[in-house]
Amino acid sequence: MSTQNNQSIRSSCDRCRSHKLKCTVAPENSRSGSNRCTRCIRAQVTCVFGHRSQSKRSTNVKKADIKSGTNSQETTSMQASTIVPGRVSVSPDLWVGRQEVEEGLPIGSDGGPSMGDGDLWAELGTNHDLNVFDLTPSSLPTYNSQQQFSATDFCSAPMVPHSDLSAINSQEWQFDVSEHPDQTTTAPHVIVQLSALVTNIHETSKSLGESFWASLAESSQLKNYPIGRVLSLSQDFTAILECIWMSKTMDYKQSSSFVTSESDGQDGISSFELEDVLDYGELLSTVGTSPGRSDFSTSTHSSVATAVDMPTMLLVLSCYTSLTKLYSLVFEHFESHLSHLPHSYTSPTSHTSPRWGLGLQLGELPSADETCTKVYTAVQILLDAFQSVEDVVGLPRSLSAVRQQTCGKEEEAESGDVFNRASLWTDFLAKSVFKATVKGTSEEDCEEIRQLSIKVKSLKALIRERMKL
C-alpha cells in the first residue's frame, strides 16, 4: 500500500468508530498485513478500515481561489469605494467568526487541517494595523458564492481599540472660524442701534425731568448731576453716524467704478432728486421746493445720500431732535440753579481791593466760585460733544444750535449752505421734519434748535456774570 493511500485510511475501523471505542490493532496482525483490530477479532467480524473523506474546507478554498481570479477587479473596486482611505485596524476574530459559520466545525478540530489566528495573519503578512489597499484578492480568505464576505460587512466589523480610523479625518474636517470671517457674529444693524439710542435718550430725559434737579436748594446737590449719561449719549450718536458714513462711502466708491462719469458742464450740479428718496407728494407740496433742487455741492455727496435709506434718515433726525431736547433740559437745570445763587457767594473777595504790584503772582488772584467753575466746564464739554454730533450729521448752518453762535451775519444768511462734509439729506427735507415736531404755529422752521441756541447763550452769559469775567 502506498504512502498516499496510507494517509487516506482512517486509524480506526468502522465498527469502533460507530461505537466510539478505541481501535487497537494487534502487533502480530500488523506484521501479517491483516490489519484487524482486537475487538473485531474477538467478535469474529470483518474489520474494515475506511478511507478519510476529503476535507470540505480545502475544497472550498480551491473553488474560491479559482473564482477569485475572475472577480479580483470587482472586489478591489468595491473595497476602494466603500472603505475610507488610511490605516484600518481589523480584528482577527472577524475571519474566525465567518469560518465557524461556514464550516460548522470548531477551529482546530480533528476533522481536518485548520489555520489558527496567528497563522492567518502571518499568511497575510501584516500586524494588527492592516492597510486595506495592500490586500490582494488571493490573500483574503474567501468562501462560496452564496455567503461571500462583502465590503459592507467589512466596514461594519468591530475595530481593535487602537484603531487609527478616527484619527484620519479628525484634523481634516475641523472647522476653523478664522478662515470663515463671514460666519462670525456681526454688529447689530444701524437701524437697531439708532432705535435703541432714541429709547435711551427718552428715558434719560424722563428721569431728569421728573427728578429733583429742577429745584435745587443747595449747591452741593449739583455735584451729583449725571452729566456722564448725557455725554455718553452724544458720543454714541457720533460713533453710529461715523459708521454710517464709512459704510456708505465705501459702497459708493465700489459702485462708482461701474458708472460712467457725467459731462464737464454738469459737474457742479447734483443729479440727486428728492423723488429718489421720498415718494410723498404732500411733503413736496408743503415744502414748496422743486424736486430738482439740490443743496449738495458735488455728485459724490448726492450719491452717498441716496445710498442711505429713508428709515435711517428719519431715525437720525429723531435722535438729533431728542438729543436737542435733552440738552435744553440739562442747561435749564444749570441756569435755574445758578440764578438762585447769591452774588456774594460766588466771589467773596471781589469787593476787596488787594494791592497789586510787581510782586503779584497768579495764585494771589481772586478765584471764582467752585460751583460756577464746574458748571462752566460741564457746559463746554457737553457743547463740544454736541458740536461733534452736528458736524457728523451735516445739517445746514441754519439748523445748527452751536455753529450759529460762532458765525457772522453773512454766514447766517446763507441758509442753503452745508458743511464741506456730505449731508444725509437736503436742507428743505431736514427743515420739514423739524417743522413737523414744532408745537403750535411759529414762523421759525426749527423752534427746538432755536430754543437750545438761546438757552446756551443765556447760560454762558450767566456763568460769566457769576464768575466776574
Curated annotation (Swiss-Prot):
Record keyword Glycoprotein present: no
Region of interest (Disordered), ranges: 58-84
Highest taxon in the source lineage: Eukaryota
Gene3D superfamilies associated with the record: Zn(2)-C6 fungal-type DNA-binding domain
Polar residues bias: start-end ranges: 68-82
Record carries keyword Protease: no
The protein, known as: Equisetin cluster transcription factor eqxR
Organism field: Fusarium heterosporum
Gene: eqxR
